[in-house]
Amino acid sequence: MRSTNVTDPFAGFKAAQRHGWSTFAPLENQTTPPAARLVNHAGIRAGQRVLDVACGTAVVAVTAARRGASVTALDLTPELLARARENAGIAGVTVDFHEGDVEQLPFEASTFDVVVSQFGHIFAPRPDVAIAEMLRVLKPGGTIAFSTWPPELCLGRIFALSARFGPPLPPGVPPPVLWGDPNVVRERLGSAVKNLVFDRGTMAVPTLSPAHHRDVTERTAGPMRKIVEVLSASDPARLTEFRTEYEAVISEYLKDNEVRQDYLLTRATKI
């Protein structure tokens, strides 16, 4: 294992993220179908060593392990790792779990055949550091693959809305949804990879109404929880405005009791 005793200028920000995402587990039913799509996109097969970065409740890790891969999974949030271990146990698969940070991966260079992340690594405050770490632990010729939210579509627009109403990101931290722009992804991966491929997928989220979608998200997703916490105490009228705009966005993507949340899939080979 590699030492990660490095001073982190974003330690406070990451501590807030750790707390904010601690209630995410109920959303795993939404992220489970896209997990299989990412595993397919990455071409994961039996016998490969796979790292799932920012694994959450391990829907990707367990899916890969059920296909015979040797899986390691890492997340910043202990509460999500507790549920991740439960999921692996229920599925009857072995996953090597670690509490840790994508910007300081505790693994030696060139360890894994495949490195994946589903809607997780995008929250790292320094994209250049995160992607460098993901590529560092990947073997030459190995596959890096991830799922992200395009800024112009449903969840990207919700993130932009949240940025308007919520606390600002620390100086120098870019919006997570930039990872959903193929041009940005291409630039961030740069000359370290070849065979860069993009695809699209859709997360169909069952919901009775835009208000139901908002209610669930407010109770589970870190950025939304923070907005409600701050505005309910300081500016209830602005909270009402936020909720109205949120439901208006969701209504554009709601049909037949499903919210269509499209995402970007990326795959590349490390040179």
What kind of region is each of these model predictions?
Residues 2-48, 59, 83, 87-90:
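Conserved class I S-adenosyl-L-methionine
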Residues 10, 28-31, 178-271:
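Conserved Class I S-adenosyl-L-methionine
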Residues 27-28, 128-129, 135, 139-209:
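Conserved catalytic/acceptor-binding region of the Class I
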Residues 49-105, 129:
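Class I SAM-dependent methyltransferase SAM/SAH-binding core
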Residues 103-114:
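A short acidic, Gly/Pro-enriched loop at the edge of an enzyme's catalytic core
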Residues 113-127:
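A short SAM/SAH-binding and catalytic strip from SAM-dependent methyltransferases
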